[in-house]
């Protein structure tokens, strides 16, 4: 989306895994954001209609050699033009370094939810953790060397309390505030938690307001965009796909579209919109890789044919090819690469059986913006957690033109589009299922026996969640088969069977997540049923890990 008609917030990426959540926060308040890497050249931004700048967090230490920094001329341009700057975590530390402050390793690293005190001259006596920072016996002593404001900093305007809960994730902290900066918040373990410069309209926070666990995070972005940057012109991010579809419509008479269809919401909604344009020149391909859930291959194909009776859809059974190539493979990234490679090979074989001109063919993908960010930030800035199946497995010599109408949208945006299309609720509310399928839910080596055990466990778990009315309250739920076995008793005999883990999480973004507290009586019923009906399992565990430090999937 070009967005010239909108007031822009420039978001500069220092490699944060939460980077896309900044964009999402801005989308939520109808602000257009332009994203660039930290090393952007001045010539590339001077002609933009920039109303403000946000500096993201990142996995580096700002004081280490080779860590990412803004170009000096770019930072000085922001100061010269007095473009408001909002630094988040690493971004705040970058501001401190650029303006002759100091950053050092934290004595106490902070991770997760933390209460932050918003500071003013009239409320510092309420601070109770003074002795955490040396010998200060009172708040007056503690803050005597810092400039405090008489009024609440405008970044925190309309926050109802002087204490707000935020998401922390840092090892370093600012230890010396640059000259002419105010100290505007502190936490129990981080004295300099937020800073503000009135002359240049610069704001820095050590925490992550973009993460949904930061209770007043969206309000901070609203204050920055509308009250500080004075943005006025709004845009509707969910209409992005309309522009993409309009751009591709000119090809509908002499081009084709092919799509890998899984039955998931992203690929299904993308196919529904694109099929409306290309009609008989649209071809959907559903590949059964042998790694799907119980009866899923047949159920998905039947669903797609009944929902889109006029759509060309081909089903390919490639299960034996996938399973034979995965034999003996235990490393999860290797599994993903093998599956990605085989998928492309099978897909290309299927396409070659269709009478179309490959040079005039688009490959439709339901890639979402979080897919791109979580897999790999530009220039390897961000630590790669996992290769995403939509963006990690595509070959460099891809023969098709790539069409990704949802690449700047988020999951809830696609759900809105699904409802606009009146697609069945089973699609709109379907939990995410990874591209590599059960390959990354069977820990270690994969074989048919393990897959069948996992299918039965997962089927009982999901169906019971639906029966008890919990499924739609949960963001994602699934079962995992561990590689280890445990000793048990069946009847009077010893058993030595697999251990299964049940996982259910609640999340708004899938970048952070909390484990879902299934009522104990329901969890007991589900567990009892699994152990009674599924052979090969004698122990069930329930995962109570949040993300971070865990990821949602095990592999």
UniProtKB/Swiss-Prot annotation:
InterPro entries for the chain: Class_I_gatase-like, GATASE, GMP_synth_C, GMP_synth_GATase, GMP_synthase, GMPS_ATP_PPase_dom, NAD/GMP_synthase, Rossmann-like_a/b/a_fold
Gene name for this UniProt entry: GMPS
Activity at various pH: Optimum pH is 7.4 with glutamine as substrate. Optimum pH is 9.2 with NH4(+) as exogenous source of ammonia.
The record's note on its domains: The glutamine amidotransferase type-1 (GATase) domain hydrolyzes glutamine into glutamate and ammonia where ammonia is then use for the amination of adenyl-XMP intermediate. Upon binding of glutamine, the GATase domain undergoes a conformational change involving an 85 degree rotation, which is required for channeling ammonia from the GATase domain to the GMPS ATP-PPase domain. The GMPS ATP-PPase domain catalyzes the condensation of XMP with ATP to form the intermediate product XMP-AMP. ATP binds first, and its binding is required for the subsequent XMP binding.
Domain of life according to the entry: Eukaryota
Cross-referenced Pfam families: GATase, GMP_synt_C, NAD_synthase
Effect seen on changing residue 25 to L: No effect on glutaminase activity. 1.4-fold decrease in affinity for glutamine
Domain GMPS ATP-PPase span(s) in chain numbering: 235-430
Feature type site, description Important for ATPPase activity: 371, 388-389
An example Gene Ontology CC term for this record: cytosol
Protein name per the record: GMP synthase [glutamine-hydrolyzing]
Species whose genome carries this gene: Plasmodium falciparum (isolate 3D7)
Outcome of swapping residue 18 to F: Slight increase in affinity for glutamine. No defect in glutaminase activity
EC number of this enzyme: 6.3.5.2
Annotated phenotype, changing residue 172 to A: 172-fold decrease in affinity for glutamine. Severe loss of glutaminase activity
